[in-house]
Amino acid sequence: VQWCNRLGRENIASPVLILMDYIVTYFDPNKIFGLTDNAFPDLSYYGGGMMMTPNKNEEGGYLGMHVDAIIHGTNKNWKREYSVLLGLSEEYDSSFDLLVHNGKEHGRIPYKFNRLYAFKCSENSWHGLPEITKGLDKKTLGIMYWSKISDEERDSIETKAKFNDNLEFN
C-alpha cells in the first residue's frame, strides 16, 4: 500500500483534507455502532489519508489478510477503535474481506466507488483485499478512530501489525 500518512495533516493535499475533515465532522462510529462511547478521530490523520494498492505489471495489486497496528504510532496511549475507508476507484471491481473479531465469522463486502466502509478494530479484526481487479489500482481514503488507554492496558496489547495469507474462509 502506498500513500499512507505518517507525517501529519500538513502533508495531505487540500482537497483530500477537506473531504477527511468533512467525514470526521459527520461520521461518529460511537453513535452508529454503539460499541464504544469514547472513540475520536486523530485530526493529524496518522496512518490514514490517501492509500493505493498498485497494479504491478498489469497483474493487479494485492493486500493480503492482516490486522493493523492497534497502538498509535506517536500517541502511545491511543488504541485504534475503528478504521473507516472510502472507496475512490470508480472502475474497480473486487471485494473487501473482513473476519469478525472472533476470527471465525467471514464477510465479503463488494468494493464500490464512494462507499464508506467502517469496522471495529481489535487484535483479531483480520481484513484484506485478496481478489484484485487486473489492470487497475485500488484507491481508498483512510481515517482511524482512537480511544485513550492506560499504560497498563497498552502494555497488554500486541502493538505490531500481523499478516496471514493462509486464512481459510468457510
Question: At which residue positions do the language-model features occur?
Answer:
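Fe(II)/2-oxoglutarate oxygenase catalytic core
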Residues: V1-A118, E123-N170
